[in-house]
Amino acid sequence: MTNAQRADSAGMPLDVNVLIGPYPYRYVPHPDPDVLVRVLAREGLRGAWVGHLPSAFYRDPTPGNAALFAALEPHRAVLAPAPCIRPDWPRWERALRDAVEQGAVAIRAYPPQWGMGPHDRSLQALAAAIGEIRSILLLTVRFEDLRQRGNLDVAGDLDAATIRATVRSAPNTRVVVTAAGREMIEQVHWGLTPDERARLWWDISWIWGPPDDHLAHLFRTLGAERFVYGTQWPMRLTQTPRANLDLLPDDLRDARLADAGEIELR
């Protein structure tokens, strides 16, 4: 059995970080749910939490959420919606309830795109509300490397201070952070209490494997159980996380990621 298969007790991981829809700053090929279903089958993944890529850049994400639910309806056995809720927008509380009633598996938020910093009260209110309804807050550090971004994309990366403050502000909320690298993960992890760390997971879509071996280092220092499987398709290659797991050193051959399905049930 490979390390990639050990990522999940069933041998088929669940991808917490995929997106559908166009990207506003460059062409992204085939970001469609029917293509995604075939990609998941090819990669041996049992399903995915799916966000709507353009909604991150809408002032009002409501139409994007409607488009997400409609697009995923034929594929709900495999694709679970993860809509975004903007907490400084009118009637966001109702939008959150509606999303959960429609089967949202997690709620995405995009603080950099919405101009929200570490002490933004609306972001903290959203985090607390997500905890109250027993859902999961999903944050995204970045969509592209800074060196790739177009001049119109002026939002920076999600910073460590905002992640820490958000986790601290909502003691009943589970948080999954996607697209973070080793430095960001360490800045956040070592700045939290053990109880706070226990409610926080990281996907592995942006963590380097060999020769830097950042993934192996993080498994040894934080524990593999703090990480979940994520690819950030279609922005990144779906094969990269699996390859990085397969290339883990021998001393980590029994390392096992947290299962996103189990996080849902906590």
Language model feature labels by segment:
Residues 46, 59-145:
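Active-site gating/metal-coordination segments in enzymes
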Residues 17, 40, 68, 72, ...:
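Conserved, mostly hydrophobic/aromatic
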Residues 33-40, 65-72, 96, 123, ...:
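Generic structural signal for well-ordered alpha-helices
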Residues 13-16, 49-52, 82-84, 108, ...:
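Active-site neighborhood of phospho(di)ester-bond hydrolases with catalytic His/Asp-centered motifs
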Residues 17-23, 140, 179:
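Histidine-centered divalent metal-coordination motifs
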Residues 1-18, 25, 30-47, 97, ...:
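Mid-to-C-terminal alpha-helical segments outside catalytic/metal-binding sites
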Residues 24-31, 55-63, 85-93, 114-121, ...:
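Acidic-and-aromatic substrate-binding clefts and catalytic sites of carbohydrate-active enzymes
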Residues 106, 119-228:
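Catalytic pocket-lining loop regions of alpha/beta-barrel enzymes
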